[in-house]
């Protein structure tokens, strides 16, 4: 892996955002896409024109050439070199049009994934058409139809409804457009899926709490408080199960209590407060499914004066929790990172190789996880 510096290849990535139901590409937008594709083709053949060569030399950053006829790489700054691995051996044979349908443009994790896809598209010299699924099945289906009408070559779909994913996959197959489903499968055993190990997401948290509880509270029998979000589907259920199983395998007598956060930090705070009121004594291991809600949990613990009685693990590695990780006296031990920053860099080489020569991605690709603690925070996030 090498550090790359940012330079936008002129016209390589046309970003279109489809946000409302029934949205279709306007003639003006289509013209912009056509113009961008033309510019990309011109940049690809710049070696044959001395004037274009001079322009390339004076542009910000440099291009890395592949074989004759392939789209050159544009160097892009990699902000998190300990997280992102750039496949420098893959080159696009053409300026393909990649559609990326985001889970929800208002979700912090989704935004990171979207930006990683855009950066990877810039690097590989392909166009990117961006959609927002809005966590809405109907919108996800509409986005698929719009992408088909726009003539995309590949579809990257981040959506957590399996039935809609399957319908999208079938519709794309009718048009000969390949797909990778992100985080949640489409058609089992048919469509490639890129997803984290949700069960391991929970076990990493449980393992850390078991270790810390034994060291911090020798001879004590702490209870386990699990703040999950089962309404959001199997991925979140698996995370909670992983945490519980990890703790119970090491401490089988542990009493377990569960709530739903309903995906809301304030609900998390209030239900944690109620739990602490009902359990005014003893040591507690706490787990929460996402960092933003963990902050609500922490607020309840602080208000109750129970900081010395509680240890907390979380999920997401969102910057909102980094300040707590830096504190030696914080009850927050760690947060599991799924490294959303690398998703696009993993996905684009698979898509490009399939478009180049028909090499289909594996049915399952699982990126690495790690739990971010005070000890390794700056290794992964130097600017935290």
Task: Kindly give the residue locations of the regions a language model identified.
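C-terminal motif of bacterial Sec signal peptides marking the signal peptidase cleavage site
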Residues: 15-18
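Bacterial signal peptide processing site
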Residues: 20-23
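Hinge/cleft segment of the Venus flytrap/periplasmic-binding protein
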Residues: 60-96, 227-228, 246-247, 339-384
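Hydrophobic alpha-helical segments within soluble ligand-binding/sensing domains
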Residues: 75-85, 91-92, 140, 193-222, ...
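Hinge/beta->alpha junction and helix N-cap segments in small-molecule ligand-binding domains
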Residues: 101-114, 130-139, 161, 183, ...
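An alpha-beta-alpha
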Residues: 102-104, 117, 205-253, 258, ...
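Hydrophobic alpha-helical
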Residues: 154-174, 243, 261-324
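Flexible loop/hinge segments that line or gate small-molecule binding clefts
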Residues: 162-200, 318-327, 381
